[in-house]
Amino acid sequence: MANVVENLGKLERRVTISLPKDVVQKEIDARIQKLAKNVRMPGFRPGKVPLKMVAQQYAGQVEAEVLSDKIGQEFFTISRSENLRVAGQPSFAPKQDAAQEGAYAFDATFEVYPEVKIGDLATAEVERSTTTIGDAEIDRTLDILRKQRVHFHARGEGGEHGDGGADTSAQNGDRVTVDFVGKIDGVAFQGGTAEDFVFVLGEGRMLPEFETAALGLKTGEAREFDLKFPDDYHGKDVAGKTAQFTVTMKKVEWPHLPAIDADFAKSLGIEDGDLTKMREEIKENLGREAKRRTQSIVKNQVMDALLKISELDVPKALIEQDQQRLVEMARQDLAQRGVPNAKDAPIPVEMFAEQAERRVKLGLVLAELVKANGLEAKPEQIRAEVDEFAKSYEDPKEVVRWYYSNQQRLAEMEAFVVESNVVDFVLGKAKVTDKEVSFEALASATAQA
C-alpha cells in the first residue's frame, strides 16, 4: 500500500506507520525466548525460569522496545521510498482513530529540509577592509613589547639604570606600595583596609579619587581624602556611599623600559640580535595577524550578504537542536572558567533562539552554495592552510603533525577552508568596495565582532 505523506505546513509533514500485530508479536516472542536464557528469578537456576513467568515479568518492556525499533525502521524505509529529507527527529504518537484490526498504527510527525533559493550574487554588497603594515605599526608593537618587559626601581636609589630623577614623589606609571584604611561614618567596611597593596598609577585599576590621592606622595607620607563609590559599584554594600580614606605611601618605584638593542632582539627569538631582522619578523607577524583579521571581517560581511539575498524556511527542529547545542557550549565555557556546578547551570534555551536561527539558516544556505558550485575543500587546500597556520610557531613541522593526528582538528580546518572557498566565490561575483583601515582600527573591529 502506498504511503500517504500529509502536508501540515511549509515544512511539517505527517505519515501513518502501520505494523502488523502478528509480525510484532513474533519479534516479542523471539526476544523473550532469548531473554529467558539469562534471566534470574528467586528459586530458579539461571536460564531455567519458565517462559510464561518471563513473559509475565518482561512482556510490557519488550513490547515497547520492539515497537520503538519497528517504528524507527519503518519510518526510515518510508522516508527513503518517498525521498523525504527529514530535518531533526520525528515524533511518534499512537493513531487514536485507526480502525485497523490486526495492526498497530502510529502517526509520525516531522519536518523536511527546505528549498533554498539564493538570489543573484551580483546584487550582494560587501565592504572589504585592507591595511598596510608600516614603520608606525612596527614601532607601536615594539612599544607594547617593551612595556610587557618593564621592570621597576625604587625612586631615589641609584643603580645601573639611574635613580628615576630628582623628584621622588609618585608619578603616573610608577608602581606604588601603600597601606590604606577606609571608613564610612567612622565604621570600617569589608575590603576597605589593606597593607602592602601594590598597583601601577595610571592603569585605571583603582578608582580615580584613590589614584589622585596617591599621586605626588613620597615614601612615608600619608594623605586623607573622601571617595564616593559609584552607584553601580560591584560592592553593593558601599555602592553610592562616601568613604573617608587614609593612604600611606610605603614604596615608590619608577618604570624602566628595556632599550631596543641586540639583547632585546634576542629576547624576541632573533638569535644573532640583528635589529633589522627583528623588525622584519615583527612586520611578517603583523601581516599574518592583519590578514587573519581582515578575513574574519570580510567573512562576516559575506555571510550577512548571503542571508540578505536568500529565501528559505528554517526547520524548527534544527533551531531547537542548535539552541541546546549552544546551551551546552555555554556550560562548558562556564566550567572552563571554574564556575561550580557549571554542567547543571540553569541557562534558558530561549536566550539563544535568534543566534540559533541565524546559524541554522546560514548553514543551509552555505550547504546549498557549496553543493551547487563545487566549493568543497580539497586536500591540498587543507594542507596549505595547516602549513600557513604552523608558520607562526617555533616548530611548524610538529604543529602539522599535531593537526593530522586528530580528525576533529582536521575537520575544523576543512570547515574553515570551505568557508574561505565560499567567501572567495562570493567576492568574485558581488559588488566589492575596498576600504583602507589602520591596524589599530582593524584590531578594534574584530574585538567587537
Swiss-Prot record:
Alphabetically ordered keywords of this record: Cell cycle, Cell division, Chaperone, Cytoplasm, Isomerase, Rotamase
Gene Ontology MF terms: peptidyl-prolyl cis-trans isomerase activity; protein folding chaperone; ribosome binding
InterPro entries xref list: PPIase_dom_sf, PPIase_FKBP_dom, Trig_fac, Trigger_fac_C, Trigger_fac_C_sf, Trigger_fac_ribosome-bd_bac, Trigger_fac_ribosome-bd_sf, Trigger_fact/SurA_dom_sf
Protein name: Trigger factor
Record remark on domains: Consists of 3 domains; the N-terminus binds the ribosome, the middle domain has PPIase activity, while the C-terminus has intrinsic chaperone activity on its own.
PROSITE patterns found in the cross-reference section: FKBP_PPIASE
Source organism of the structure: Burkholderia thailandensis (strain ATCC 700388 / DSM 13276 / CCUG 48851 / CIP 106301 / E264)
Any GO BP annotation: chaperone-mediated protein folding
Subcellular localization: Cytoplasm
Family: Belongs to the FKBP-type PPIase family. Tig subfamily.
Gene3D superfamilies associated with the record: 3.10.50.40, Trigger factor ribosome-binding domain, Trigger factor, C-terminal domain
PPIase FKBP-type domain: residues covered: 173-258
Classification via Pfam families: FKBP_C, Trigger_C, Trigger_N
EC number in record: 5.2.1.8
